[in-house]
Amino acid sequence: MDRAVGRVALENEEREAKNTWRFVFRIAIFLLIVITLAISAAALVYSMEASTPGDLVGIPTVISRAEEKITSALSSNQDVVDRIYKQVALESPLALLNTESVIMNAITSLSYQINGAANNSGCGAPVHDPDYIGGIGKELIVDDASDVTSFYPSAFQEHLNFIPAPTTGSGCTRIPSFDISATHYCYTHNVILSGCRDHSHSHQYLALGVLRTSATGRVFFSTLRSINLDDNQNRKSCSVSATPLGCDMLCSKITETEEEDYSSVTPTSMVHGRLGFDGQYHEKDLDVITLFKDWVANYPGVGGGSFIDNRVWFPVYGGLKPNSPSDTAQEGRYVIYKRYNDTCPDEQDYQIRMAKSSYKPGRFGGKRVQQAILSIKVSTSLGEDPVLTVPPNTVTLMGPEGRVLTVGTSHFLYQRGSSYFSPALLYPMTVNNKTATLHSPYTFNAFTRPGSVPCQASARCPNSCVTGVYTDPYPLVFHRNHTLRGVFGTMLDDKQARLNPVSAVFDNISRSRITRVSSSSTKAAYTTSTCFKVVKTNKTYCLSIAEISNTLFGEFRIVPLLVEILKEDGV
């Protein structure tokens, strides 16, 4: 019993001792916390000099500024990401596609030649310098924002003249035609020995060449093959086109004046010729009796043709045989194009009557003067599978000289302003199954041509006339959706006379600052323009081949005028 009581007493003493030590430990911890807080408060007061709530008012502003800096940095990073995406997803694939296109064109050209070696088509395809890869036949300026007329031509640049000139006072070189492909260019003009008005005999100069860059970086045109067709065949109104087999050319063979030809009852003889890469020329007469059975006169459009879908497409115009199926199909058809902000004051019925009469000018005996497009299959056989397209006159004006051209994936037909409408016209053209379809044209109100009254440069009403001059525009500035914004060209800046050639960039209403060939009294005639880019330097150039009056050697000298396209700052 005593032992049990003693054990209980001992346990009570041990429990009291533990409780005492717990209490002492808690007091010690509490004192330590108080001392730590006191020291921390003292240190805080010392370091911040006892900041009050008023001192913290500016903190939200500081935080806001920090947020702005962070947001700006993130935005900058997003711009970088966007540029990287644009480069990787858009620009690089397009560049690769351009390069692929050039390579495929070159391979196609070589393939044609290899397959045609047995037919003397020649080997050794010429190719432009690598600096031009992806810069020929492309949309050169793609810009949705800048004013078209902020682009303008430089002063004319000295370069190698690749065009032969007359060597006597009675010599005449006229009617230049030019076309360039991804691999080579083609050029032709007519040579008359006894003055420009002789229709009975002439030569035809035809050349094939490539674009080169000199050691100092200058552009020049290098002629590799040329021929002077002096064989008693009077070729006229020739159009040339660069194709995978060389330089294809369409000409009429003339033995009478134009007025006499329109008075005849049979079509005009035509030939499809080719200057091959080996320097040999061959040609074949077309079966005009079948192909132009509804025509009394038919001529190539003078301007260059274009190689599209394994066919070469040439502009054609001439007179339809009265009451023939083609003539009957156009009866009553007409179109009226209007000047920008300059309405014709004539009554509508009178305008319609005059518009209809404009297709049958009195100069050609009232024959309907019609626009057409001729496509020919490009093969080692000349004149193969020709197909003639006659567009409706609800789209086209009276048939004049013209040009077919391709830029990027777009095709166009230029119509010379031989009728009442003075501003330059470019019709979008689509091709399908060997035929062409023309659509409502782009018009360039400030790109006019001189003409006789009542169809002078400022004319605004439909009338019957045969006037004007060939001055084609070249598509230069595009929207990103591939629609055309502006063109380059060399116009004759006079109301009635063939005077004052000037080069400029044109939108649908106005023009850029000009580059003048010489004085305003300088005589000139036909001009044909083509633009390209030196990809290595990213510089865009335009070539205007122009007939400029000559006072000593011949009536005209054909001059290749070269400019660089510049841009005004901040426009």
Swiss-Prot record:
The encoding gene: HN
Secretion signal span: none
Organism in which the protein naturally occurs: Newcastle disease virus (strain Italien/45)
Entry's localization field: Virion membrane; Host cell membrane
Glycosylation sites: N119, N341, N433, N481, N508, N538
Gene Ontology BP annotations: symbiont entry into host cell; virion attachment to host cell
Protein name: Hemagglutinin-neuraminidase
Function in brief: Mediates the viral entry into the host cell together with fusion/F protein. Attaches the virus to sialic acid-containing cell receptors and thereby initiates infection. Binding of HN protein to the receptor induces a conformational change that allows the F protein to trigger virion/cell membranes fusion.
Catalytic activity as recorded in UniProt: Hydrolysis of alpha-(2->3)-, alpha-(2->6)-, alpha-(2->8)- glycosidic linkages of terminal sialic acid residues in oligosaccharides, glycoproteins, glycolipids, colominic acid and synthetic substrates
